[in-house]
Swiss-Prot record:
ATP-specific succinyl-CoA synthetase functions in the citric acid cycle (TCA), coupling the hydrolysis of succinyl-CoA to the synthesis of ATP and thus represents the only step of substrate-level phosphorylation in the TCA. The beta subunit provides nucleotide specificity of the enzyme and binds the substrate succinate, while the binding sites for coenzyme A and phosphate are found in the alpha subunit. The lineage of its organism: Eukaryota, Metazoa, Chordata, Craniata, Vertebrata. The gene is Sucla2. It is found in: Mitochondrion. The modification N6-acetyllysine is found at residues 22, 26, 196. The keyword Ribonucleoprotein does not apply. InterPro entries: ATP-grasp_succ-CoA_synth-type, Succinyl-CoA_synth-like. ATP binds at residue 5. Belongs to the succinate/malate CoA ligase beta subunit family. ATP-specific subunit beta subfamily. Keywords: Acetylation, ATP-binding, Ligase, Mitochondrion, Nucleotide-binding, Phosphoprotein, Tricarboxylic acid cycle. This is Succinate--CoA ligase [ADP-forming] subunit beta, mitochondrial. It comes from Mesocricetus auratus (Golden hamster).
């Protein structure tokens, strides 16, 4: 009893009749994959992989008596197939162990989610923001990156400057009901009105500094 396996980088390739043979699986994409070779072998497979286990933050070896399929499907539909002892015949134990050691030594897997690609430019946001100011003759005093652990007091104190450049790309934390929302100094739905309030606030702070007067103010939120 043998199987014919298409040699493409995708799972779910084993079929049980010619009518099922397709070059399109859920791992190949709609366009499928070009197959240049096939493998004819005995209908006996093992699944073996190395993955990261969160509970102890280290690699773990996964073995299954059902090869050629996604291990996620096996775990959900047939968990007893994931075995603690592989049950290799004695004549292939040494060969299997050697392959496992080689696989472990090569263990490295990086997955990139294409939906997260847009976030990469966020880390350049600081340089871009400060560079724009310098090109127009300004000198940024600070770049504020508000993390998830920022307190209301920290956010409020950080805004005690003469001018504020708020440059937001996407946003990592929610604004509704969060510390950022609680610590806001000015709240205005109209951008023109908000700009006027910022200018007036800046003028007041400037005059106070020139007069060496410590002015405290409170605006309605």
């Amino acid at each position: 009893d043998v199987v014919i396996k298409a040699q493409v980088l995708a799972g779910g390739r084993i079929v049980f009749s010619p009518e099922e043979a397709k070059l399109i699986t859920k791992q190949t994409g709609a366009k499928g994959r070009i197959c240049n070779q096939v493998l004819v072998c005995e209908r006996r497979e093992y699944y073996f992989a190395i993955t990261m286990e969160r509970s102890f933050q280290g690699p773990v070896l996964i073995g299954s008596a059902q090869g050629g399929v996604n291990i996620e499907d096996v775990a959900a539909e047939n968990p007893e197939a994931i075995v603690k002892k592989m049950g290799f015949p004695s004549n292939i134990v040494d060969s299997a162990a050697e392959n496992m050691i080689k696989l472990y030594n090569l263990f490295l897997k990086i997955n990139f989610d294409s939906n997260s690609a847009y976030r990469q430019k966020i880390f350049d946001l600081q340089d871009w923001s400060q560079e724009d100011e310098r090109l127009h003759g300004g000198t940024p005093a600070n770049f504020l990156d508000v993390g998830g652990g920022a307190t209301v007091q920290q956010v409020t104190e950080a805004f005690k400057v003469q001018a504020i450049l708020v440059n937001i790309f996407g946003g990592i934390m929610r604004l509704q009901g969060t510390r950022v929302d609680d610590a806001k100094i000015l709240a205005c739905d109209d951008l023109d009105e908000a700009a006027k309030m910022v200018v007036k606030l800046s003028e007041i702070v400037t005059l106070a500094k020139e007069a060496h007067v410590d002015v405290k103010f409170q605006l309605p939120i």
